[in-house]
Amino acid sequence: MESNNNNLNLDMEKDQETTFDYSKRAQWLRAAVLGANDGLVSTASLMMGIGAVKQDVRIMLLTGFAGLVAGACSMAIGEFISVYSQYDIEVAQMKRESGGETKKEKLPSPTQAAIASALAFTLGAIVPLLAAAFVKEYKVRIGVIVAAVTLALVMFGWLGAVLGKAPVVKSLVRVLIGGWLAMAITFGFTKLVGSHGL
């Protein structure tokens, strides 16, 4: 009898594993990967842009820090509004389907998504800040930022692909090309504008 109960418990655990709702995981993964990539690329691009016209490390770091704070706040607010809108839609849908009853534990939390997005953005933004903080030579600093951002993009791209069960190589190529383009365009345009004294 006891062995039958054990078998029943094992079967129930297997059923729970096979019926696991991956939509929550996808929501968190999307917010975390987007936040980290955005923090990494936007802060690095901002620092590279300022670096194109001002070689002072202090100005570059202050600009990067301002970008970190503004970006983390923006990501948190945007994610909160987005997830709250989704939450409202899903609650209304559940009420229509079940006659007024809702199972709110299945729904994503807007506050948690906002916090996760802000933390992920901050984590990404810290990479170029730390890379630039200890290098005084301008050209070396730019090279170190690009190298650190490239390494972080590879890590974030790989992690996102593995957790999301997506093709790793395609994910890495997309992430790397996007990051490099953003930094190159920002640097180039700022250099162009700065050289004309605007």
Swiss-Prot record:
Annotated InterPro entries: Ccc1_fam
Entry GO CC: vacuolar membrane
Topological domains annotated Cytoplasmic: 1-32, 82-114, 163-174
Compartments, record wording: Vacuole membrane
UniProt cross-references to Pfam families, sorted A to Z: VIT1 (PF01988)
GO MF annotations in UniProt: manganese ion transmembrane transporter activity
Membrane-topology annotation of the record: Multi-pass membrane protein
Catalytic activity: Fe(2+)(in) = Fe(2+)(out)
Residues passing through the membrane, by range: 33-53, 61-81, 115-135, 142-162, 175-195
Superkingdom classification of source: Eukaryota
Vacuolar-side segments: 54-60, 136-141, 196-198
Listed GO biological process terms: intracellular manganese ion homeostasis; iron ion transport
Function of the protein: Probable vacuolar iron transporter that may be involved in the regulation of iron distribution throughout the plant.
Similarity comment: family membership: Belongs to the CCC1 family.
Name of protein: Vacuolar iron transporter homolog 4
Organism: Arabidopsis thaliana
